[in-house]
Amino acid sequence: MEFSQEAFLAFLLAAKRATYAAQGDDVTVPALLPGARQLEYRDGAFLYRDVYFGGAYFVGQETVYYEDVPIWAMSYAGGVAPTITADAEIGAIYAFLRTALLQGTPDRPYRGPQTFQDGPYTYADDSAGGLHAFWGRETISQENRTIYALRYSGGFLR
């Protein structure tokens, strides 16, 4: 089972951009687990699968397979502040999040860029480690108030 880190990174970024961040339903497949949403993206021997539960607050896991063997995973949990309940506001925050996630780069492939600002929202991501083992926290703020937060961790499986 041989693949280069460059090929893996290119695939991971393409998969993330084509799934949740794309804002479309083209990659939604029937979920393996009851009550979950499942997104998948395949290119050659690589398969990306994102399975999550919830909406305003959610928990999920991304897994990358190579030749049908799981090789990398990231678990995550987070959501909008509990005081935010209006569907329109939640929708606007998640639309901004998707825009931020489209800005991921090979040196920051887990979520979005270190910082990103558009309109009233500011996205920030603080992570540590590398592809083999990492963890981090992303936030969205508005007028110096955190309105969304998510924690994540993962790495290559051994």
Please report, for each region that a protein language model flagged, where it lies by residue.
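Cysteine-centric segments in proteins
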Residues: 1-158
